[in-house]
């Protein structure tokens, strides 16, 4: 299961929505890295479908030499040179809860003597050690991620990101563990903490998505801003790992289409169709759920199942 979006001492106030129908991306050309062989990616992700959405991609040859890290129904890490796999890791663990936030950490250090220590993948603080495909990099391999070329967030060889992204760190020159970014709270739930690990390195960045007018703004202090494409101010949303909002479930719907980060459902004309969501209602207080019809359907039913 994913993280429950519980409030913690460290609050994340917003995320960036990547609504796949808008073709959103963030782009940036990296500089000469601090260390091309050593880096860490950390991101909180809430996916909207089963496809592999790109969290970080390098691709300058149209899919012949490329690398990316994706999350969909599983986590994949690929690095290909001239069509041959240098890294190919695909988790056997599946991540099907589209109502939950997942914390993904990928730590790379290809100088390690043991191959399984050269790439470590974690989800919600747990290291993933079972892979359907497991090709680890050779020792001292210079990967294509973190090289001095154009990089993408939200689009890639294996699919576009359809979901929400929050608290996205990239640290150039350090292989870190999830303990730098999260902890288990008293209820046994993995929650975020503030990163205090020091320098981000030559290519590092911290995307907190705090500025709705500039969603690619790097708030690490390094000034490594990204260019936002097809992302509007409205794509800064309050759905976050510490304030999880309900969305419609792509695994429990009719033949209609979900969009807008699984907040909108378009039915099929002339047919009954439906979509469901999971809503966690607190034990006390007064709470409201609003559903709005954006079309001229004559019969719309809204109900609760307990």
Describe these PLM feature segments.
Residues 1-20, 42-50, 68-139:
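Extracellular glycan-interaction surfaces
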Residues 142-165:
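Extracellular glycan-interaction patches encoded by glycine-rich segments
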Residues 1-14, 21-23, 113-115, 120, ...:
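Extended recognition patches within non-cytosolic domains
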Residues 46-47, 246, 251-252, 263-306:
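Conserved, ordered domain cores of eukaryotic regulatory proteins
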Residues 21-76, 113-115, 176-179, 281-283, ...:
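Extracellular glycan-recognition modules
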Residues 17-19, 57-59, 66-70, 76-80, ...:
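Beta-strand-rich, repetitive solenoid scaffolds
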Residues 41-49, 104-106, 165-170, 207-208, ...:
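Short hydrophobic/aromatic patches on beta-strands that form ligand-binding or substrate-lining surfaces
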Residues 1-37, 74, 81-86, 147-149, ...:
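Low-complexity, glycine/proline/serine-rich flexible segments
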């Amino acid at each position: 299961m994913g993280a429950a979006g519980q409030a913690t001492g460290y609050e994340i106030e917003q995320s960036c929505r990547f609504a796949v129908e808008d073709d959103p991306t963030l782009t940036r050309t990296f500089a000469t890295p601090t260390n091309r062989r050593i880096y860490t990616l950390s991101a909180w992700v809430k996916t909207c479908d089963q496809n592999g959405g790109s969290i970080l991609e390098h691709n300058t040859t149209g899919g012949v030499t490329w690398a990316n890290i994706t999350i969909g129904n599983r986590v994949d890490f690929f690095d290909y040179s001239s069509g041959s796999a240098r890294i190919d890791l695909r988790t056997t663990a599946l991540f099907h809860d589209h109502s939950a936030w997942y914390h993904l950490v990928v730590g790379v250090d290809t100088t390690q003597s043991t191959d399984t220590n050269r790439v470590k993948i974690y989800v919600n603080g747990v290291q993933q050690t079972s892979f359907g495909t497991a090709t680890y990099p050779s020792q001292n391999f210079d990967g294509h991620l973190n090289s001095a070329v154009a990089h993408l967030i939200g689009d890639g060889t294996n699919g576009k990101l359809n979901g929400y992204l929050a608290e996205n760190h990239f640290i150039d020159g350090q292989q870190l563990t999830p303990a730098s970014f999260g902890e288990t709270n008293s209820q046994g739930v993995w929650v975020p903490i503030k990163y205090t690990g020091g320098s981000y390195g030559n290519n590092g960045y911290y995307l907190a998505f705090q500025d709705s007018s500039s969603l690619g703004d790097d708030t690490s202090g390094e000034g490594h801003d990204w260019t936002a494409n097809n992302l509007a101010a409205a794509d800064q949303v309050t759905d976050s790992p510490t304030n999880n909002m309900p969305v419609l479930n792509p695994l429990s719907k009719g033949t209609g289409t979900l969009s807008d980060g699984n907040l909108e459902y378009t039915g099929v004309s002339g047919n009954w169709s439906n979509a469901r969501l999971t809503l966690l209602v607190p034990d006390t207080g007064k709470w409201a759920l609003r559903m709005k019809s954006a079309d001229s359907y004559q019969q719309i039913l809204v109900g609760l199942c307990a």
